[in-house]
Amino acid sequence: AHDPYLPPPVAESIHVKLVSAKDIMEQSDVISNHMIQTPEVYNFFCDDFFNGLKKAPIFLNVARGDSVDEDALLRALESGKISAAGLDVFKDENPDLTHCPFVGRDNVIITPHAAFYSAESYLRMQNISVGNIIHYLKKEYQQVNRIVNGIEA
């Protein structure tokens, strides 16, 4: 994974190997974007990124749309730099899909951003969140699930 904010000890504890963005570009069969929206990641996935790919991976964008230059992604799909894409977000949060160049392509799947939501998933998400808070307040740090940024004991 490439995450400049994930402390290496936390990555190791959850069996994640941190690598550079260049390593991702050269080695990945699938690239899954989960970036938060910040000025630093605006158009992170651009022509330079896609042109640096070595393996024609599948590209998944489940983050905010601003991190992907959609014109560059379209060029990467057309040139074969990206073999396929799964998209549930666009730069425009309410896109007009009647004129969207990704619609109708054999190598693109578009889903609504809320694709996983169900009554069961909301309940599970709430239970995990409350459980994490309780474990944290009791200083049971090893019991906290889905740590993104490490917890200092």
Give the label of every model feature segment.
Residues A56-A153:
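Rossmann-like dinucleotide-binding domain for NAD(H)/NADP(H)
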Residues Y5-C100:
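Rossmann-like adenosine-cofactor binding region
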